[in-house]
Every structure is written in C-alpha cells, then in structure tokens.
C-alpha cells in the first residue's frame, strides 16, 4: 500500500489546522513507516496499479485482515482484524464512525470503491490525536475517505464511469461538482449496481462433484451522496454531507445438495446527514465539532408454508444521534495535547411482539498526548467510556463504566536511515450488541463487556530513492492479543441457544508488508505490493472443553496477497493474487468443518487517453483467472472465473 509521503517530523493532527511550524528532520518517510501503530493506506491513485476491483479486494491487500464474504456482488462483507472479530473493528466514513448497534458489524459492500479517495487501516490507536473519542473505542479502525469538493474551481468537474461484467453485472457511476466563488464548493455522487449473481459452483456428493448454479441471488443497490464545503477563512472549514443507500437483494442461503431453492429477501435503507466544523481558535488551540443523525431500516422476508400466513416478515429500524467535540492544544513545538467528548444515542425498534425496544446512551471522553522530537515519537491516551442501556418493558437499567489506556512509541536509531522501531499497547472493551443482549431466546441481559488487551512490536524501513529503485517500504509487526469475557453462544437446552461470557481468546502472529517501485525506462516502472500474515487465534476458555487451544472459526494460520504492475505509456498490465490456508467453521475444528485453503489470481489491463484536458480510461479485468473453487464462509461458495470491463470519462 502506498500513500503520499509526509515528513517524518510532521504532526498530522496539528499541521492542517495550525500555523505553528514544527521541527522537521531531513529524512522523509511515509506514514506507514513512521507511525507508532501499524497503519496501511491505499489511495485511489493506487487502485489501478494493484488491480483492485472492489472494496473487499482492497481490504484483502492489507495484512492481518480476515474478510468474511458471502459471495457475489453486493454480498455481505465484514472485517475481522488479528482474530478479534468484526465487532472489534470500527469503520469511519469521512471522520464519523459508522454504527450498527444491533449486530455490531459494518457491511463494507455498501460503499462504492469509485467514491473513495483513500482507505486506511490502523491497528491500535491512530497517531492523529485530533479525532473523536469514538474512533479510539475500537481495537482497530477502517477509515474511508470520500472525494472532497474542489474549492476555487468554478468550472464543472465531471467523472462518469460505466462497468459491466459477468453474471449480469452492470454499474453506472457519476461524480459532479464545482466551486461557488472562492470559498465554497459542492459535490454530488451517485452509483447503481445490478447483478444476477447466478454463477456456477461445485458441491461434493460422495466421491463425485456436482455442479450447481446460484439462484435467488440477484441484487439492486443504489447510492447517492451530496457534499458541501465552505471555508469562511484560511483557518476554518465547514463540511456538510447527506448520504442515502437503498438495496434489495434476494438471499440464496447456504448451498445444500439437491436443495437450491430459497425464497428469502432483504431490503436495506440507510440515510444519514452529518456536519463538521474545524477551526483554529488561537496560535495554540484548535477546535473540531461534528454532529450526525443516522436512520436505517431492514426488512427480512422468507416465503415458506411453514410460517403462519405463508410468510415470515421481520422489520427493524435503528436510529442514532451523535455529537462530538475535540480540542487540540500545541503549547510548544513537538508537543500536542487533546481532549475529546462524544455522546451518541441508539435505539432499535421492530415489528416482533416479543421485542423489548432497547435504547442506549453512550458517553466517551478521551484525553490524549503526543510528543515528537527528531528521532522519537510517543503517544498516550486515556479513554473513559460510560454506557447506559434501557432494555424497555420495565427492565432495570444496565450501566457499564471503564477507563482504558493506550500508549505507543516510535524511534529512529540512525538519523540518516529511515529505519524505525515501534512499540504500542492498547486496552479497550466492547459493549455487547443489542442482538447479544436482547434477541428473543438468544440474547442475555446479564452479559458483561469483552475486555481486550493488544500488544504490538514492529520494525519499519523506507529506502531513500536510488537510481534503480524509486520507492521501497517494508514493515514487520509481531503482536499478542488477549480477550476476556468473550461472548459466545452456548446451548440452553436442546432447542434454544443463549449468549454468555464464557470465552477467553489469545491471538498472536506476525504481519509483513512490502511496497516497491522500480523505474525501467522513461515513463515505465514496475510496481510491487505484497503482504503476508501468520496468525494463531486460540480458544483458552477451559482445558476440559473440546475447543481448548483450537483455532478460532474462519481464522487461517497463513494468509497473504501480492500484485505486480507494469506501468507504461501503452497498455499497463497488472497481475495479482490473494489467498489463505485451511480454516474451520466451528470452534472444535472437526474434520468435517474444514474449509480448504485457496489462492485466487487475477489480471488487469488499462490505458488512459488524455486530450484537451480530459481523460478517458479503458480497463479490463480477468477475475479468478484459474477458476479456483472455494468458500470463505461455509456453504456460501465464491464465484469462479469472471470478467469485468469499464470505461471512465473525466471532464
């Protein structure tokens, strides 16, 4: 993953909002190398070079990531990092955390890759301390940044793209905006996706293999976004965003031999509005405030004669109101202090008679410090979290309060070399989701939060540009994670399962990443990106249990990805691959639940024509070129060989 270089001595939390000049060392290195915590960024300009075709593909290119993908365009895609589970991964969109208090998981398939200017992953605490407290309330974070309006350019800026592919896939996309005067700008984006997802798959039948075709798997997604930016002066910025997403998809269900029939469907609607204002109050103080309201609706239907009236119709509505304020102080060069206060309210309503309509008040306060001097950077954070749940129907209020610390250091042993050593620790706890607490015959209101401790030690290196190599970044990180009060499902009786705090999990491993670019001839280069992860995530609940010291479900020991691109003036070519070793779908690691490892390869070719200040790009992709047959989630087969082609015009 490649991002724009920043000066090793810069402080990104303060440089953008203060005029104070910070001490700068002569060595330059990207953020991935100088950060006190593992950080990986993929910028939009790197997507073509890496052969990335979707947001799940982008996530696959980051070390330590386990993606749960149910297959097909628009299929549910959630992220687990370093064996902690998707509920421990926070996802923010343009600076505001995305929330799903019902399940605790964010479906990344909702977000269009075309609308992303960059996507970053931070494991532990972000080095930027001028952020909402909620951003620090997750073990790891995925940060998505969309395109910003272009300030000061009054001409109409237009980008239009059309993508078509196998299995009936078609997706138009448009981005249009312009400046209003010298200090205002607007931007509108929209996209639509349709796919039949009727791909073939193989299913074993004794000693034979039977070929089937996915049915009841079509999807229609639509998304629009409106952005407005105003800069009243050189030190203040107001951003306003409205987001709307609408999706209808049929659900094929698990693949079962001789039973490919399904009548399930899911309707999703999500909309939110947010506004943020950032300003410099004085030479040493800066302020950032943000407000957001989010509304989402899910409707699940299953038409089957076993239900009264022949149909199961479950409807859920979630609402969230969120406000945050952050104050940054830079009293002297190299020292930054910040305080953040966040409040958010969540509730959940459904048409289920037994549902008790819970709501939650959350208050987070973060006190942060960062110090940088030439070869040394240190960060520290204390996060106070207060949660109050009101289950409803006369149930007693549930309260949890906890103070969690984190700290990190990065130092450069030799000032003439971009070689860094980093150490960091983060303690955090996760509140149970509404499903885990209140779901009928499943949840338990007596659950305690999960407590997580993360330790990381890493080495990073950036080679200064040479005649034979223009860029080389290498990172190696080892880690140890421990989770107490792990929330697991256990059988209450023969028919009913319930949630309880029985689990303890320990995870340890090594993450490696490498990015390199080699100039070949004039206007030609070879660009290489790769990552590898070795991970053991083990159940440590009880020695007399069958799952003692067994690998967690869907957690491979080995995983990795790579891409090699030949950039040239004619037709640029990319080869890429990702894969993982075998996994198990159950905690007991029974042989019958083993999922085979896989390695998927793909190829891409693209060229950009430039004329009269405009651009026209043509691109073709061969996906899963060698037709690998595999499952990421048990009984949800992934597509085999497929293709896509796109044309993009920029005015």
Indicate residue ranges for each PLM-predicted region.
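Extracytoplasmic beta-strand/coil segments of soluble accessory domains associated
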Residues: 56, 60-97
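A beta-strand signature from Gram-negative outer-membrane beta-barrel systems
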Residues: 113-159
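Membrane-embedded beta-barrel scaffold of Gram-negative outer-membrane proteins
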Residues: 284-302, 421-424, 450-508, 513-517
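Gram-negative outer-membrane beta-barrel transporters
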Residues: 333, 338, 375-378, 473-482, ...
């Amino acid at each position: 993953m490649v991002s724009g270089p920043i000066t090793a001595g810069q402080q990104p939390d303060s440089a953008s909002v203060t005029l104070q000049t910070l001490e700068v060392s002569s060595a330059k290195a990207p953020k991935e190398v100088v950060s006190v915590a593992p950080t990986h960024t993929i910028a939009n300009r790197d997507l073509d070079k890496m052969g990335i075709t979707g947001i799940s593909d982008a996530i696959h290119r980051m070390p330590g990531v386990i993606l749960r993908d149910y297959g097909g365009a628009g299929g549910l895609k959630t992220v687990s990092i370093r064996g902690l589970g998707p509920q421990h991964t926070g996802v923010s969109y343009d600076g505001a955390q995305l929330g799903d208090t019902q399940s605790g998981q964010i479906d990344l398939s909702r977000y269009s890759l075309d609308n992303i200017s960059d996507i970053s992953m931070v494991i532990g605490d972000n080095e930027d301390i001028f952020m909402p407290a909620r951003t620090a309330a997750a073990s790891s974070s995925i940060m998505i940044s969309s395109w910003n309006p272009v300030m000061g350019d009054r001409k109409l800026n237009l980008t239009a793209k059309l993508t078509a592919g196998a299995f009936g896939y078609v997706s138009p996309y448009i981005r249009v905006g312009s400046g209003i005067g010298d200090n205002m700008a607007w931007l509108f984006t929209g996209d639509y996706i349709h796919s039949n997802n009727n791909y073939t798959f193989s299913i074993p039948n004794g000693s034979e293999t039977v070929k089937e075709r996915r049915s009841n798997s079509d999807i229609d997604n639509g998304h629009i976004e409106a952005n407005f930016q105003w800069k009243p002066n050189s030190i203040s910025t107001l951003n306003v965003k409205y987001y709307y997403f609408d999706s209808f998809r049929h659900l094929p269900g698990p693949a079962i031999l001789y039973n490919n029939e399904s009548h399930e469907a899911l309707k999703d609607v999500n909309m939110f509005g947010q506004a943020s204002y950032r300003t410099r109050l004085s030479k040493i103080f800066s302020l950032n405030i943000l407000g957001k309201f989010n509304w989402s609706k899910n409707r699940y239907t299953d038409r089957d004669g076993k239900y009264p009236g022949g149909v199961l119709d479950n409807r859920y509505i979630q609402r969230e109101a969120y406000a945050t304020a952050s104050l940054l102080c830079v009293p002297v060069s190299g020292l930054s202090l910040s305080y953040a206060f966040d409040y958010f309210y969540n509730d959940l309503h459904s048409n289920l008679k037994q549902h008790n309509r819970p709501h939650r008040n959350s208050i987070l306060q973060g006190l942060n410090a960062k110090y940088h001097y030439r070869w040394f950077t240190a960060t520290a954070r204390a996060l106070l979290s207060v949660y109050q749940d009101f289950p409803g129907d006369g149930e007693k209020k549930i309260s949890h309060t906890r103070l969690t610390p984190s700290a990190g250091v990065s130092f450069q042993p030799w000032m003439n070399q971009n070689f860094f050593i980093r150490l960091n620790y983060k303690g955090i706890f996760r509140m149970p989701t509404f499903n885990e607490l209140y779901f009928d015959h499943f949840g338990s209101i007596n659950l305690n939060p999960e407590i997580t401790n993360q330790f990381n030690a890493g080495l990073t290196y950036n080679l200064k540009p040479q005649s034979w190599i223009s860029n080389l970044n290498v990172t190696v990180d080892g880690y140890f994670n421990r989770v107490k009060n792990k929330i697991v499902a256990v059988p209450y009786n023969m028919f009913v399962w319930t949630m309880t705090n029985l689990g303890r999990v320990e995870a340890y491993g090594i993450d490696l990443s490498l990015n390199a670019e080699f100039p070949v001839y004039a206007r030609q280069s070879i660009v290489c990106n790769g990552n590898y992860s070795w991970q053991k995530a083990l159940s440590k609940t009880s020695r007399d249990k069958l799952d003692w010291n067994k690998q967690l479900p869907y957690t491979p020991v080995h995983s990795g990805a790579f891409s090699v691109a030949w950039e040239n003036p004619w037709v640029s070519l990319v080869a890429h691959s990702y894969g993982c070793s075998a996994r198990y779908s159950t905690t007991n690691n029974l042989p019958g639940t083993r999922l085979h490892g896989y390695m998927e390869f793909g190829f891409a070719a693209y060229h950009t024509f430039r004329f009269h200040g405009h651009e026209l790009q043509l691109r073709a992709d061969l996906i899963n070129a060698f037709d690998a047959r595999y499952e990421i989630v048990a009984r949800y087969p992934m597509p085999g060989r497929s293709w896509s082609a796109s044309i993009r015009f920029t005015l």
